[in-house]
């Protein structure tokens, strides 16, 4: 009985609270699926889960813009470039959230490779830049993302993704730690 009540309590009070939008989901397909992106194999995998771009075989360049609630202050920009090579796939990405007085920027360099027909892995190095108005200095941090995907069947894939596993800090008066994000999905 206690276990059931605990489970119900956890499920009722689980809420997504984002203090930073650093690992935001890119691409209309992922957004239309309720931010599901960890097991998808598409162009925006360079932003969502680098392992998903391992099978990408065409050079691609893309941009997206999202105007949240019709407010320019909540706008979200994404851009990416994917370059497949013989031994894997490279990707470059950038994202920006905010406006001139407050914004979060993320620049990334990714590499993904298929180790077998069923196993794909990806790594992305990120440089984060935060601008808190002209009165404050810009804050910077470096981190990385890891992704893993496995095709269980032709129509079913399992994916795991982690952003900022080492819990990077912003050098400020209070040494703010950036969030660790873990995603898992089918």
Please annotate each region the language model reported.
Residues 4-14:
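Sec-dependent N-terminal signal peptides
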Residues 20-186:
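Subset of outer-membrane beta-barrel
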Residues 15-19:
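Bacterial Sec-dependent signal peptides at the C-terminal "C-region" and cleavage site
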